Amino acid sequence: MEFSYFLPVNIQFGWNKVDNIAGFAAPYGKKALIVTGRTSAKKSGLYDRVVAKLDAAHIEHVLFDQVDANPLTTTALDGAALAKSESCDMVIAIGGGSIMDCAKGIAFMAVNDGDINDYIFNRKTSDNALPLIVIPTTCGTGSEGNGFGVLTNPETGDKKSLRCNAIVPKVSIVDPAVMGTMPPHVLASVGFDALCHNIEAYTSKTAQPFTDALAHYAVTLLAQYLVPLYKHVKAIANGQEAVLNKKQLTKAWESVTLASTIGGMVINTAGVTLGHGMEHPASGLKDITHGVGLAVIEPVVVEYTWSANPEKFNSLARIFNHGDGSELGEALRLIVHDLDLTTNLTELGFTKKDIPWLVDNVYVVATGNIANTVAKISRDDIEVLYKKML
């Protein structure tokens, strides 16, 4: 046995940890670029809460709030230009995976020259970036736990990760208390993304003992708590009776949030596999929500690949009270149903005419995902799988 495990991220987990933002930021300078989406962090009051703490500590700040879902490389460049012009010492991200990923691109390009796409496709390398602090407001992408920033090139539709240790956050403030403003549909999609991260890392070719232990634990947490938490949030949003009592709700938020962060950590080392490799072209082409795309793709991929590593897939199936790995795809479909997620690509606007582009783009942005998948995958296999998903 031989492996290495390296993940230099300071995770600060706990209720109301966000109130310590100034203390976490102080070692990195006196001026921050705050990266958010257009409305959510402001409507929830979290942005004002963070700003008040920074003001009290005399840490200056400037706002960049132009990030949308499936963030673009061009948006990251706009943010980097602002960080440069304002002489910011650090970047603070407040938001979900799109915000954190874009903030990583901003922090990176604020100190590096050239075309960001050259770095994404490894034509150029650098291990420098502004210090990054993240406050995740959704529990799904796990971006707080790794050195990946997924960005889409608007000219080509290529959706691929910027990857380097420099964009691993210096501090990740993982506060379950700030998750509660998520609408039900957001919780469903990000929660399923977290589940896929852990499943793919656990079954990847580059899995190792540390990632196996973490990912298996995270899948256990999500199997127990994700659907009940979603049903509770949905009931409250619809003005119905609560599903969980206060103690159960606290435990559920902690568990799903923790599992999400673990998912980000394990993919930093063990990577993701074909499920993510096939979803990125889909959301690059149609701008669909990542977790919604995975809800269609992951069950089909699991059914196609499980027999290449039955021991691992059998272990996962048992978590969901299914007999063996051949039933894991069906277990995932039941979760998709319970989360009210989409079950086919047709409902997301795809047709047979899109399949050639999707297949080609897998080989542009996701050859590493194919190589990391335990089953041997061909171009014809990917075409067959996309057709099954329509």
Where are these regions (language model features)?
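Active-site pocket-lining segment
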Residues: 287-346
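Glycine/threonine-rich beta-strand-loop-alpha-helix active-site module
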Residues: 74-177
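Carboxylate- and glycine-rich phosphate/diphosphate-binding segment that chelates Mg2+/Mn2+
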Residues: 148-270
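Glycine-rich phosphate/pyrophosphate-binding beta-alpha loops
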Residues: 140, 261-294, 368-369
